[in-house]
Curated annotation (Swiss-Prot):
Subcellular location: Endoplasmic reticulum lumen
GO cellular component, one term: endoplasmic reticulum lumen
A Pfam family that the UniProt record links to this protein: HSP70
Domain of life per record: Eukaryota
Chief place where the protein resides: endoplasmic reticulum
Source organism: Nicotiana tabacum (Common tobacco)
PANTHER family linked: HEAT SHOCK PROTEIN 70KDA
Record function comment: Probably plays a role in facilitating the assembly of multimeric protein complexes inside the ER.
The protein's name in its UniProt record: Luminal-binding protein 8
Family under the similarity heading: Belongs to the heat shock protein 70 family.
Biased composition (Acidic residues): 284-293
Residues of this chain annotated as glycosylated in UniProt: 244
One MF term in the entry's GO annotations: ATP-dependent protein folding chaperone
Length: 293
């Protein structure tokens, strides 16, 4: 109906003229009727071969350590859609995690929009990074979002339902958020990389501390001087982290290399001596490396 749009379509399709044989208002009404028939299951043979796609207008995700927007359902994902991801705890003996649900395209949740939150309690006390919390996002055909968090060890779970009529964004607001994400993409990337570098260092250090104090892992396999070296290196790294909250990505990466240079040779030698094989020199395989809540 809009001449400019017609021209853009023509240019996009290499000069091919758009089909103007259908009244625009009738096209909208027809599409709505077909979609209604498909969703209700009453379309019969006339709609069985017709596919109408609806998509998530903005990325959906949760907040993880450092205020990071961890994405579960990306923008423009065809709905209905379902996605699960396993997360873990950030602190030792942590028995509760807060699931904060956001929509938006930025790397940090402070620049996205909070949709809702809930707590999962009753997690068995364990060292940081041990519990496995499975978070599931499910968007139905009506755009209603169901979020569930389950502790895989105990089976305890909590959930929240977010409907698409409770203050959700207008099309103009959605377009503004997408535009802002594009505008700040490079800046957001640098901030995210810095947070990831800090989290990698922190996770490695705590993993080392847990391993050398766990009898099922390294506690009974290390010589006293070896254990002392690792304890000293990890203690100094944690003190450095406390004193350098705003360090750059390269600083965190350099500090991680320093700690690895002390710990990895000791860990490798212990496993070789015992005839075992370390699950990666950091002591954790990629499959066990989960974002922290």
């Amino acid at each position: 109906r809009i001449p400019k749009v017609q021209q853009l379509l023509k240019d996009y399709f290499d000069g091919k003229e758009p089909n103007k044989g259908v009244n625009p208002d009738e096209a909208v009404a027809y599409g709505a009727a077909v979609q209604g028939g498909i969703l209700s299951g009453e379309g019969g043979d006339e709609t069985k071969d017709i596919l109408l796609l609806d998509v998530a207008p903005l990325t959906l995700g949760i907040e993880t350590v450092g205020g990071v927007m961890t994405k579960l359902i990306p923008r423009n994902t065809v709905i209905p859609s379902k996605k699960s991801q396993v997360f873990t705890t950030y602190q030792d003996q942590q028995t509760t995690v807060t699931i904060q649900v956001f929509e938006g395209e930025r790397s940090l949740t402070k620049d996205c929009r909070l949709l809702g939150k809930f707590d999962l309690t009753g997690i068995a006390p364990a060292p940081r990074g041990t519990p496995q919390i499975e978070v599931t996002f499910e968007v139905d055909a009506n755009g209603i979002l169901n979020v569930k968090a389950e502790d895989k060890a105990s089976g305890k779970s909590e959930k929240i339902t977010i409907t698409n009529d409770k203050g959700r964004l207008s099309q103009e607001e959605i377009e503004r958020m997408v535009k802002e994400a594009e505008e700040f993409a490079e800046e957001d990337k640098k901030v995210k990389e810095r947070i990831d570098a800090r989290n990698s260092l922190e996770t490695y250090v705590y993993n080392m501390r847990n391993q050398i104090n766990d009898k099922d892992k390294l506690a009974d396999k290390l010589e006293s001087d070896e254990k002392e070296k690792i304890e000293t290196a990890t203690k100094e790294a944690l003190e450095w982290l406390d004193d350098n909250q705003s360090a750059e990505k390269e600083d965190y990466e350099e500090k991680l290399k320093e700690v690895e240079a002390v710990c990895n040779p000791i860990i490798t030698a212990v496993y070789q001596k015992s005839g075992g094989a370390p699950g990666g020199e950091s002591g954790a395989s990629e499959d066990d490396d989960h974002d922290e809540l």
